[in-house]
Amino acid sequence: MRYLNTKNIIAAGVLLSCMSSIAWGAIIPDRTRIIMNESDKGEALKLTNQSKNLPYLAQTWIEDTKGNKSRDFIVTVPPMVRLNPSEQIQIRMITQEKIAQLPKDRETLFYFNVREIPPKTDKKNVMQVTMQHALKLFWRPKAIELEDDGVMTYEKVEIIRRNDGSIRFNNKMPYHVTLGYIGTNGVTMLPQTQSLMVTPFSYANTQFKNVPSTFQVGYINDFGGLSFYEINCPVVNNICNISVANRDQ
């Protein structure tokens, strides 16, 4: 059986508001990213078998940012489950004692992996393809948890337009910042199915150049949608002016 690993596609930024744009297989999760707050001690996610005819197995596990499987900080329960046609089940993510060793002043990134395993077929000369996906899982320590109705704002991300027209994003926040849109008039300059993620208290530069002095950015928020901001950069190599755009999807 061949395994088709789509982690690079998903992690690169297909985690946008429209799940229909993602090439999920039969098994789909109920969200495109996971936020785990320290005070909650765990989180739950629903998986649905979209097939109306076939049962599937779903295998789940946690990986670190280097792609290593890990049970030290978070475990999935159950790690393997059968879903009958059109069935929906719940997967729990439970923190372990070692979670206390993670930084208290910033998010830690993990990946929640789900692999769907189809039933064996009696047909000859048929290759079965098993889909595997990875969702970003952000563990958020108590010191930086948002209120229940809190909405992430991104004004603390400094944006600088450089001489060559490339853009630098200085992330002054304790959260991972993911850009799903950089462009003008609804046309993104990001390569297709890609995004740009800036880790807490760090910076990242765009690989593309010649960005105009006025443009928009869309940050992927906690709900998987895009929060848009208007950017105006009258002077190169200086911090740009930022204001909330009149749309939020």
From Swiss-Prot:
Compartments reported by the entry = Periplasm
* Pfam families, alphabetized: PapD_C, PapD_N
- Any one of the GO CC terms: outer membrane-bounded periplasmic space
Q: Name one GO molecular function term.
A: protein folding chaperone
InterPro entries associated with the record: Ig-like_fold, PapD-like_sf, Periplasmic_pilus_chap, Pili_assmbl_chap_C_dom_sf, Pili_assmbl_chaperone_bac, Pili_assmbl_chaperone_C, Pili_assmbl_chaperone_CS, Pili_assmbl_chaperone_N
| First and last residue of the signal peptide | 1-25
> What keywords appear on the UniProt entry?
Chaperone, Fimbrium biogenesis, Immunoglobulin domain, Periplasm, Signal
| Origin superkingdom | Bacteria
* Gene Ontology terms: biological process: cell wall organization; chaperone-mediated protein folding; DNA damage response
SUPFAM superfamilies assigned: PapD-like, Periplasmic chaperone C-domain
The entry's function note states: Could be required for the biogenesis of a putative fimbria.
Q: Which family does it belong to?
A: Belongs to the periplasmic pilus chaperone family.
Its protein name is Uncharacterized fimbrial chaperone YqiH
Organism from which the protein derives: Escherichia coli (strain K12)
- Protein's gene: yqiH
